[in-house]
Amino acid sequence: MAEDLEISKGSKEEQYENLLPQIEGLLTGENNQIANLANVTAALKEQFNFFWVGFYLVDTENELVLAPFQGPIACTRIRKGRGVCGTAWQQEKTLIVPDVEKFPGHIACSSLSKSEIVLPLYKQGNIIGVLDVDSDKLNSFDEIDEKYLTQILKLLDN
């Protein structure tokens, strides 16, 4: 349960290692996608204090729509190929952006966002959305985030 989330200190990798089984426990036995997406965003926000963490889900063949998130209000819709989220969706790959100001076509939902990682979310082999994580610091994301966030997203593919 959310109130039982154990926040850990230590290296980024140690924090993910501690969080991963807790997220798995939150998701076990719950089939409602919205509930699971909401709990994942809350757990990530609580553990890492990211500026913004949330999901965008495929709404039409060319547009993502905002889904559960934690953080300031956000862009509601993002077109395929636009910004970091739309590009990650179009390319079906993880994008790590050390400085969002240098990303061509970046959509500034908040001027406080400085770096970002976006990962595709799959269900039964089909991309159904993206996980978007923003930091208010430059160069916040790396291959450790990609590795563990990918593992978390695999838990949602049920």
From Swiss-Prot:
InterPro entries: GAF, GAF-like_dom_sf, Phosphatase_reg/MetRdx
GO molecular function, one term: L-methionine-(R)-S-oxide reductase activity
Superkingdom of the source species: Eukaryota
A GO cellular component entry from the record: cytosol
Any one Pfam family match given in the protein's UniProt record, by short name: GAF_2
TM stretches of this protein: none
GAF domain location: 32-158
Family per similarity comment: Belongs to the free Met sulfoxide reductase family.
Protein name according to UniProt: GAF domain-containing protein A
Species the sequence originates in: Dictyostelium discoideum
Gene: gafA
